[in-house]
């Protein structure tokens, strides 16, 4: 259907003269008069249409002029503030400008509504609407309708488009809610599968270390972070000396006394009968120590080695005599002779110390409430034991080679870069060998 915006009626639309019962001259005069009236009517309609057109143009021009004036009023203060803004940006660093608080700009966009109203209906549409026939009288059927609906609504519904728009918006809203519900269910399902499948287990970590003094292998097993302390397992190596065993199992037998003071005497006094003092034997209730274990706890600088005295409940035991420093071959033989363990009856108490040297302090005794197992022996270095054993001329047991498990070598993937690097290395080796052969020929 074509909507005519501006309609110009024909000359004969509004002028239908009655020509019946008139003569020829009267008919001609009547037609000329009606035609002139029709032309004048058309000119009138043209003037009305032109007036409406130019009025609309004037209104539009007026609106544009108002917008331009409003925009000009907003631009004038900006033009005045441009020089000051340029000076500020020229004299201020970017960091200073970024550190200051800034305001967010929001454009004031007013929303317009009520675009389609009765007042905004064009005249051509009103003309067509006025020409339409009125609806039939269907109110008589309303008592027979269900749910109290109007029967005229089935014939014509002015709210049809509004109802359709509301139904479409509700449908879109339901679809959006359904998609959101599906995404949430898929996310929860994926999270549940992840919790069921991916169960991370804590791997036990094993740390292997070696004691720098004794060469003992120490294995630390760390099973989980919840344990209070890691389990430490000591695995003795073949290179450990026998004195380490004595040091662990002989702590509850006796305790080594502090080193005796060394008196500096003349060479004539070094070979006196007092220096040939034989130390008392170890206690009988202890196990017989090995020859190598009797040299522990002695510094390498002393020429005469004294075994530790036995622990006794008698507090009146005299302290051991002081030893003198000597360096002869006879003293070395004497120390070798005295180093052998003696298992015999208890010997008489030792003679008093010589008057030339002060008496050493008495050895520490065990407390009344504690036993001998609470006292720990003095730690001795493996180097001093080895040096003293060499000085005594004892046969040392050859240490076995300590084997450490090597990690399996992983096969490296060959690529083009590795092959080229190997070729360059081989080429360099061949060139150097050729240069050496040439030099040997010239020689």
Curated annotation (Swiss-Prot):
Domain of life of the native organism? Eukaryota
Q: Where in the cell is it found?
A: Cytoplasm, Cytoskeleton; Cell projection, Pseudopodium tip; Cell projection, Filopodium tip
Q: Which UniProt keywords apply?
A: Actin-binding, Cell projection, Coiled coil, Cytoplasm, Cytoskeleton, Phagocytosis
What is the reported phenotype of gene knockout?
Amoeba grow as very small cells in suspension culture. They have reduced levels of F-actin staining during vegetative growth, and abnormal cell morphology and actin distribution during chemotaxis.
Q: Where is the composition biased (Polar residues)?
A: 221-252, 324-338
Compositionally biased intervals (Low complexity) = 263-277, 285-305
Q: Which residues form the WH2 domain?
A: 382-399
Q: One cellular component GO annotation, for this chain's record?
A: actin cytoskeleton
Q: Which residues are listed as membrane-spanning?
A: none
- Record function comment: Involved in regulation of actin and microtubule organization. Regulates phagocytosis and macropinocytosis.
- The name under which this protein is listed is Protein SCAR
What's the source species for this entry? Dictyostelium discoideum (Social amoeba)
**Name of the encoding gene:** scrA
């Amino acid at each position: 259907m074509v909507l005519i915006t501006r309609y110009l009626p024909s000359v004969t639309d509004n002028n239908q003269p009655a020509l019946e019962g008139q003569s020829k001259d009267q008919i001609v005069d009547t037609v000329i008069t009606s035609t002139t009236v029709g032309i004048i009517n058309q000119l009138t309609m043209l003037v009305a249409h032109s007036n409406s057109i130019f009025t609309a143009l004037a209104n539009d021009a007026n609106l544009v002029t108002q917008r331009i004036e409003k925009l000009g009023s907003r631009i004038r203060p900006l033009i005045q503030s441009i020089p000051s803004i340029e000076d500020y940006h020229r004299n201020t660093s970017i960091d200073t400008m970024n550190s200051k608080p800034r305001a967010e700009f929001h454009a004031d966009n007013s929303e317009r509504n009520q675009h389609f109203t009765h007042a905004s209906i064009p005249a051509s549409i009103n003309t067509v609407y006025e020409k339409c026939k009125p609806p039939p009288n269907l109110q008589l059927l309303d008592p027979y309708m269900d749910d109290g609906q109007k029967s005229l609504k089935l014939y014509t519904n002015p709210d049809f488009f509004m109802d359709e728009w509301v139904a479409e918006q509700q449908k879109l809203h339901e679809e959006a809610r359904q998609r959101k519900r599906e995404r949430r269910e898929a996310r929860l399902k994926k999270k549940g599968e992840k919790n069921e499948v991916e169960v991370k287990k804590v791997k036990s970590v094993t740390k292997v270390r070696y004691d720098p003094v004794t060469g003992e292998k120490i294995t630390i097993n760390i099973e989980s972070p919840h344990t209070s302390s890691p389990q430490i397992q000591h695995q003795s190596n073949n290179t450990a000396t026998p004195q380490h065993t004595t040091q662990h199992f002989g702590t509850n037998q006796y305790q080594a006394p502090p080193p005796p003071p060394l008196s500096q005497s003349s060479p004539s006094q070094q070979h006196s009968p007092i220096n040939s003092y034989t130390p008392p034997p170890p206690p009988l209730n202890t196990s017989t120590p090995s020859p190598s274990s009797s040299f522990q706890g002695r510094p390498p600088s002393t020429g005469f080695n004294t075994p530790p005295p036995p622990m006794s409940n008698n507090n009146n035991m005299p302290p051991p005599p002081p030893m003198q420093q000597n360096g002869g071959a006879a003293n070395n033989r004497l120390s070798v002779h005295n180093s052998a363990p003696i298992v015999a009856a208890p010997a008489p108490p030792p003679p008093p110390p010589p008057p030339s040297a002060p008496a050493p302090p008495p050895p520490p005794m065990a407390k009344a409430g504690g036993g001998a197992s609470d006292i720990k022996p003095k730690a001795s270095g493996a180097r001093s034991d080895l040096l003293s054993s060499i000085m005594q001329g004892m046969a040392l047991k050859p240490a076995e080679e300590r084997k450490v498990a090597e990690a399996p070598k992983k096969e490296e993937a060959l690529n083009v870069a590795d092959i080229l690097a190997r070729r360059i290395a081989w080429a360099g080796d061949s060139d150097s060998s050729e240069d050496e052969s040439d030099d040997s020929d010239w020689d």
